[in-house]
């Protein structure tokens, strides 16, 4: 009898086997829309202002953007609120070719804890992070559909510490589930991450040293102590 495979096995396998150039796919989407004179509506899930900086500078040339700040993984309420304020401040300071607005989702950390129950001791970048991606992208897709957006995407792919192959695989799957197009991305390409550091300095943004959840915070604190 063959052993039962974990539910996420296929996604992990596809992400590992198919090193897709998601930036190239995004370039193609942008080129096609530009040829047709179309400025689509995009819901952009934002994890924080520093990661958003380059994504907004880049995407606002081609999309009308609604930034969706939904991050129940941020365990400390004060941290959540400060990051939200920084996101709003950044948007108020930047200049955009097309309109950029922001809405914030419901803050309920218990939603995150419920999603990752049993995975508390997983290492960073493992199954717990996958559950977190799913939670945030699922709610983002539903919000995008409610608002009538053409696409939804996330700033998460800009981080060198995040698996863009996995995030895009999950995003595409969720997009198909709700009937909203997933905008493929790998924002760390074209030196996007380096550009985000430059923009963060320009706008004097708060740059946290952990992703947001209490588990990532403890991992960073442990590494510093060692």
Please report, for each region that a protein language model flagged, where it lies by residue.
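N-terminal leader/targeting signatures
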Residues: 5-6
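Nucleotide-activated chemistry modules centered on ATP-dependent adenylation/adenylyltransferase
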Residues: 9-226
């Amino acid at each position: 009898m063959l052993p039962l495979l974990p539910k996420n096995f296929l996604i992990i396998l596809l992400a590992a086997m198919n090193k897709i150039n998601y930036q190239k796919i995004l370039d193609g989407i942008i080129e096609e829309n530009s040829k047709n004179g179309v400025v689509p509506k995009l819901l952009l899930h934002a994890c924080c202002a520093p990661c958003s900086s380059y994504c907004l500078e880049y995407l606002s040339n081609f999309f009308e953007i609604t930034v969706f700040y939904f991050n129940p993984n941020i365990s400390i309420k004060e941290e959540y609120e400060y990051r939200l304020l920084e996101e709003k401040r950044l948007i108020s300071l930047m200049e955009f070719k097309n309109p950029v607005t922001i809405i914030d989702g419901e803050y309920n950390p218990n939603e995150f804890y419920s999603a990752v129950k049993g995975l508390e001791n997983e290492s960073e970048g493992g199954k717990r992070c996958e559950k977190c991606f799913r939670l945030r992208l699922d709610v983002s897709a539903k919000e995008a559909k409610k608002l009538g957006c053409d696409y939804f995407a996330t700033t998460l792919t800009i981080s060198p510490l995040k698996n863009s192959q996995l995030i895009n695989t999950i995003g595409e799957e969720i997009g198909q589930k709700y009937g909203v197009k997933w905008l493929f991305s790998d924002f760390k390409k074209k030196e996007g991450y380096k550009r985000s550091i430059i923009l963060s300095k320009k706008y004097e943004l708060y740059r946290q040293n952990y992703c947001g959840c209490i588990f990532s915070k403890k991992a960073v604190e442990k590494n510093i102590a060692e």
